[in-house]
Design a protein with these regions (language model features):
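Amphipathic alpha-helical coiled-coil segments
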Residues: 1-68, 78-86
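Small/polar (Gly/Ser/Thr/Ala-rich) solvent-exposed segments
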Residues: 89
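Metallo-beta-lactamase
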Residues: 72
């Protein structure tokens, strides 16, 4: 029983660490780069040097990636909840 709980905890801790790295990548690299790209294309469109479809594509990519980010955050919170439940059971 103790070995099973220990194994569960180790698995959850590894999954949480991995998910935290993924969330951090979104926060530090991916989302800022997509936001900057969208802003640059928006400025270009406002100055009549960019295409509307490029701007819309950047907007869609940014929004879809933000949704993926929030999914990763939800997954992280779910893992943390599972860990709390495992700790309470033992």
């Amino acid at each position: 029983m103790i070995n099973e709980a220990t194994g569960q905890m180790q698995g959850l801790l590894a999954a949480i660490a991995s998910k935290k790295r993924q969330v951090n990548l979104f926060e530090q690299n991916i989302l800022p780069a997509l936001q900057k790209n969208y802003q640059v294309l928006q400025l270009g469109y406002e100055q009549n040097t960019g295409e509307l479809f490029e701007l819309l594509d950047a907007w869609q990519t940014l929004n879809m990636t933000q949704l993926e980010y929030w999914q990763q955050v939800q997954d992280l919170l779910t893992l943390q909840t599972e860990m709390d439940k495992t700790l309470q059971q033992n």
